[in-house]
Amino acid sequence: MAVKRIKNHSSGKRQTVVVDYKSILTTSKPEKSLLVTLPKKAGRNNQGKITIRHHGGGHKRKYRIIDFKRNKDNIYGTIKSIEYDPNRTSFISLVVYADGEKRYIIAPKGIKVGDKIISGNENIDILLGNSLPLEFIPEDTLVHNIELSPNAGGQITRSAGASAQILGFDETKKYILVKLNSGEVRKFRKECRATIGTVSNDEHILENLGKAGKSRHLGVRPTVRGSAMNPNDHPHGGGEGRSPVGMDAPRTPWGKRHMGVKTRNNKKSSTSMIVRRRK
C-alpha cells in the first residue's frame, strides 16, 4: 500500500497527502443487501440542541452492516472484494460463505481477493482474518476486533492500522491479558473472540487533507478557539485583543480543567479489568 503526494501546487493541494486507493481497493459496487440509510443528525438531539460539537454537513452516505460478531462458525468464506467505507477509517471486505450468505468484515492488513477465512474454536488455524476465542490464540499474536464480553461483537481495536498483542493468561486462568495500542494492558474474558491480524489502511495516519473543504466533505465542522469567543461562550473568552487565559490552567467549554487531567471515573466496574493504565 502507498500514499501519494499531490503534485498540483495550488493552495488547496500543496500539502495534500492521500492514500492511493486505486492500488488497494476493488472496483466492485457495494453489496445492496448490506446497505441501510443513515439519517444525518448534525450533532443535534431530538430537541435540536448540540450534543456533539463539530458535526454537520458532509457527503451523503449509507451505512454498511458489518459482522463484528464473526459467529458463523466452521464455514469457510471467500474474500470477494476490498472496499472503501465512508463510516470508518479502515477498509472493509465482502465475504461470501460456502452456503451463499454474504457479510462485510473489517479488512485485515494483507488480505487479498480470493483468500479463505473461517471462524470457530480451538480447531481453527492461526491465519490472517480467522476469528476465534482469545484462549486459543498463542502469545505475542497480533489481533483486532476484540469483544469486551462474550458474544457481544468486537468493540476494541477496529480503527485503521490498529492491533493488540496477546500476552497470555492471568494467574486465575479465567482471563487473557492483552496489550492495546495505547499501551494499556487489560484483562478480557477468555471466551471473548478476536480476529487475527492488524486492521487495514495503516497509512491513514500519514494522510493530510490539504484544505478545509475536504474536512467539510467528511462532515467535520470548524473548531473555534475558546480565546476567540465571548466570555459567555467559553471560560477563555473576552479580554482586550489576544488576552491570556487568565486562570491557573486551561478549561473546557464547560469550565472543567483541561489538558493533562485524568478523566476516567475510577468507580466504573471495568476499572478492575485494567492491569496497567495507558501511557
UniProtKB/Swiss-Prot annotation:
Gene Ontology cellular-component terms listed: large ribosomal subunit
NCBIfam families noted in UniProt: rplB_bact
Residue segments, region Disordered: 223-279
Family classification: Belongs to the universal ribosomal protein uL2 family.
Coiled-coil spans in chain: none
Name of the protein this chain belongs to: Large ribosomal subunit protein uL2
Bias (Basic residues) ranges: 254-267
Quaternary structure note: Part of the 50S ribosomal subunit. Forms a bridge to the 30S subunit in the 70S ribosome.
Gene (UniProt): rplB
One GO MF term attached to the UniProt entry: structural constituent of ribosome
Keyword check for rRNA-binding: yes
Keywords associated with the record: Ribonucleoprotein, Ribosomal protein, RNA-binding, rRNA-binding
